[in-house]
Amino acid sequence: MTVPALEADALGKRFGRRSWALRDCSFRLPAGRVCAVVGPNGAGKSTLLALAAGLLAPTEGTVRVLGAHPAAARSRVGFVDQDKPLYPQLTVAETLRMGADLNPGHWDADTARRVVAGGDLDPDRRIRALSGGQRTRVALALALGKRPELLLLDEPMADLDPLARHELMGLLMGEAAAHGTTVVMSSHVVAELEDSCDHLLLVGGGKIRLSGDIDDLLAAHTWVTAPAGADLAAHEVVESRTTGRQLSAVIRPSGPLPDDWRTTTPSLEDLVLSYLRNPAAPALTPAPETLEAAV
């Protein structure tokens, strides 16, 4: 029996009397995957990661991390918050020593130093004197140095320039592959993640809209171009629009399509955007029996 890296059942979070940040979210993330958590600003991505990290308690439902309550799994999880909270008065070197002190027995000093060295950071420079991108590098060094089984990253590349983003993403993927680390990282920019991730959680309006391996999700959808007025009633329609005499649509086919329709597989970005533009489109997540079988 394989324990999922991250699983949620009817998970919900509400802050005070405000509207729900997340509601009725259920999914399973198999261990060893690199998962993109994608959605617009305010969709609930940060709330989901904070729940997984044990920084927030659910209002309803459950979340389990590596088969345990998030608090019990904390020593096996690395988390980089969107705000990169570090001690501003410490130097870079002191921050890495703190990481070693807090993670006795499983601190990888070489990896932490390599992440920092890639940014040409002065070890004696204080955190408060670093740029946003440099603080991101230090935060990632702490998270990777911990040698976690599950790495949670909330908008990790937002502060980085394109060269640093490419370099750090390559390092991150290399470390994950070498050690079998499950990586979950959020972004509202699909292009940042589609070349690196093999699993997707699409969050919109506090709900899980898509969940599964990216190849499977893409294979389940078809981009069709057909004459205006073509009958789509037999299929699940995610998005459709008509321009002149032509209809274009992203659908989940329920059977064979007419020979005069042009078909192709949508890109990941096209698929994500089609769901986000149409909140009423039916969600696609594994059925409950499939989730149980995965566990």
PLM features: what roles do these ranges have?
Residues H166-I251:
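ABC transporter nucleotide-binding domain
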Residues Q82-V138:
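ABC-family P-loop ATPase nucleotide-binding domains
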Residues A53:
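Helix-to-loop junction immediately C-terminal to a conserved catalytic motif
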Residues E60-A73:
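Conserved ABC transporter NBD signature motif
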Residues V38-P40:
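The feature captures the beta-strand-to-loop junction immediately N-terminal to the Walker
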Residues M1-D24, P30-A31, A36:
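A short, flexible loop at the N-terminus of ABC-type nucleotide-binding domains that lies
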Residues L151-E155, L160:
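Catalytic Walker B motif of ABC-type/P-loop ATPase nucleotide-binding domains
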